[in-house]
Amino acid sequence: METKSDYEDAVFYFVDDDEICSRDSIIDLIDEYITWRNHVIVFNKDITSCGRLYKELIKFDDVAIRYYGIDKINEIVEAMSEGDHYINLTEVHDQESLFATIGICAKITEHWGYKKISESKFQSLGNITDLMTDDNINILILFLEKKMN
């Protein structure tokens, strides 16, 4: 079992990156990013102290707000904090819903950080590999490549 000290010393491989990672690493990138969002809150880190890649992913929060609306996001975040709920990550069907889903997952784990809830609970959100289908990986890579150049 991971202790708070282990979590505080966690290594985030993509956090300082200024370029897109390989296609093979994109699932790890999204999983790590969502975990990192909890980590920066729990350990009072500077969320802006990251590379361009994470800064682009942080912008997905705004996509989530436009896509769902702030009231719906607050409702989802609160519901996810009150029990073992599950977000169906297979309901993503276009670029905007993909980015909004990544944004809302990050907002949920960030909120858990404020409530001192472990990011390991993220597994209850759903399997990140359900979200990162081949089509969604392609969408994300093409978008990030444009932003990183």
Curated annotation (Swiss-Prot):
Subunit comment: Interacts with DDX3; this interaction inhibits DDX3 and suppresses DDX3-mediated IFN-beta promoter induction. Interacts with TRAF6 and IRAK2; these interactions suppress TLR-dependent NF-KappaB activation.
Keywords: Host cytoplasm, Host-virus interaction, Inhibition of host innate immune response by virus, Inhibition of host NF-kappa-B by virus, Inhibition of host RLR pathway by virus, Viral immunoevasion
InterPro entries: Orthopox_K7, Poxvirus_Bcl-2-like, Poxvirus_sf
Name under which the protein is recorded: Protein K7
Superkingdom of this protein's organism: Viruses
A cellular component term, taken from the record's GO annotations: host cell cytoplasm
Induction: Expressed in the early phase of the viral replicative cycle.
Family, similarity comment: Belongs to the orthopoxvirus OPG044 family.
Subcellular location: Host cytoplasm
Pfam families: Poxv_Bcl-2-like
General function of this protein: Virulence factor that affects the acute immune response to infection. Bcl-2-like protein which, through its interaction with the DEAD box RNA helicase DDX3X/DDX3, prevents TBK1/IKKepsilon-mediated IRF3 activation. Contributes to virulence by binding to the host TRAF6 and IRAK2 and preventing host NF-kappa-B activation.
Taxonomic source organism: Monkeypox virus
GO BP terms: symbiont-mediated suppression of host innate immune response; symbiont-mediated suppression of host NF-kappaB cascade
